[in-house]
């Protein structure tokens, strides 16, 4: 008798994606309620490549407006001091590599939360490797080893491979959910305010596949 592999729910995000920060409370509830039915695999999508170039004023303005929009719609907390106290850069690949390192130590969620809180609540810049090293130490990782790994060619290739896989999935942005069942991929509707919406769609999809 062949035992079918457990369905996989992919959660695709970027630790510096403001909508992912807004979705976090709902995602935690969905995880809690769905983890007995599916295997949860997290993947980083990489919003912005490595760059030391200061973020253009127009992009800064757009992102601040996005923060205001998310705060108004979802009640998400943001500390706007970031925009006056830090030099913003449009660069999220370093933070994506940071969570890949943490994943290897079963600390991906802790690192993601540390990056999000640093960025959105404490006006710290996760585009800076020095910030990421401090956060790594805060969650119990070896700061020296982390510093060696964060910009290594091996880790950069790991991120590239992950981004290639993410781009092959049926998604249109971050955060996104995709259910993999019996070799088929199903995009799952993501509701920022209610975990039950995605949960019901996952159950319906699983039942539909089972009854084929």
For each predicted feature, which ranges?
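C-terminal cap of thioredoxin/glutaredoxin-like
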Residues: 11-12, 16, 23-32, 117-212
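A generic fold-level signal
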Residues: 4, 93, 171-172
């Amino acid at each position: 008798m062949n035992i079918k592999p457990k369905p996989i729910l992919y959660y695709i995000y970027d630790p510096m994606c403001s909508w992912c920060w807004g979705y976090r409370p709902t995602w935690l509830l969905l995880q809690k309620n769905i983890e007995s039915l599916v295997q949860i695999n997290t993947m980083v999508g990489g919003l912005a490549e490595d760059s030391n170039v200061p973020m253009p004023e127009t992009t800064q303005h757009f992102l601040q407006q996005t923060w205001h929009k998310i705060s108004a719609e979802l009640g998400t907390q943001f500390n706007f001091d970031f925009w006056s106290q830090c030099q913003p850069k449009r660069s999220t690949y370093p933070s994506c590599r940071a969570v890949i390192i943490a994943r290897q130590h079963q600390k991906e969620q802790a690192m993601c939360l540390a990056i999000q809180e640093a960025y959105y609540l404490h006006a710290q810049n996760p585009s800076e490797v020095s910030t990421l090293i401090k956060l790594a130490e805060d969650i119990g990782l070896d700061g020296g080893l982390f510093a060696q790994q964060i910009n290594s060619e091996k880790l950069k290739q790991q991120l590239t491979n992950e981004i290639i896989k993410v781009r092959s999935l049926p998604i249109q942005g971050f955060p996104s959910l995709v259910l993999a069942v019996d070799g088929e991929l199903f995009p799952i509707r993501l509701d920022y305010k209610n975990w039950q919406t995605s949960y019901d769609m996952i159950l319906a999809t699983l039942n539909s596949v089972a009854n084929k």
